[in-house]
Amino acid sequence: MNPQREAAPKSYAIRDSRQMVWVLSGNSLIAAPLSRSIKPVTLHLIACRDTEFSDKEKGNMVYLGIKGKDLCLFCAEIQGKPTLQLKLQGSQDNIGKDTCWKLVGIHTCINLDVRESCFMGTLDQWGIGVGRKKWKSSFQHHHLRKKDKDFSSMRTNIGMPGRM
């Protein structure tokens, strides 16, 4: 394995079969129809190399950052369910360090519930089906440490414009 190659972010643009893309509206991530006037976000994916967060069953944790922004995706437990959120995370200069530095990471594995008020579309290339509640095969939250659970001032919903 090449550690420098592992530390380099892999970039992904998210688009579904209906040509909906993720865009930032303030500090909210929403889905909008792809057009020339829309600038979709690009996600940076980096594997966490901190052994504290290793899990042989679930695989390596990953960091999902929004390219060019100080925002990252993470999972928070809301009403007993893992929920995808955005978090202000400081400088992206820390990406690729040997520690996850208090980030709540995401394992790339099974079912993540999303808030019922959010309609997520059909992000087919990630195996996500049409639905309001479940991502068919995407992310599962990492165990939340007590000190990481309170992000209420940084929390935001993910969904369609006008559906919040």
From Swiss-Prot:
One of its GO terms (cellular component) is extracellular region. Residues 1-4 form a propeptide. It is found in: Cytoplasm; Secreted. Keywords: Cytokine, Cytoplasm, Immunity, Inflammatory response, Innate immunity, Secreted. Expression at low levels in tonsil, bone marrow, heart, placenta, lung, testis and colon but not in any hematopoietic cell lines. Not detected in adipose tissue. Expressed at higher levels in psoriatic plaques than in symptomless psoriatic skin or healthy control skin. Increased levels are not detected in inflamed joint tissue. N-terminal truncation leads to a dramatic enhancement of its activity (>1000-fold). InterPro entries: IL-1_fam, IL1/FGF. It comes from the Eukaryota. One of its GO terms (biological process) is immune response. GO terms for molecular function: cytokine activity; interleukin-1 receptor binding. The keyword DNA-binding does not apply. Induction: By pro-inflammatory cytokines IL1A, IL1B and TNF in synovial fibroblasts. By IL1A and TNF in keratinocytes. Constitutive in articular chondrocytes. Belongs to the IL-1 family. Interacts with cargo receptor TMED10; the interaction mediates the translocation from the cytoplasm into the ERGIC (endoplasmic reticulum-Golgi intermediate compartment) and thereby secretion. This is Interleukin-36 beta. It comes from Homo sapiens.
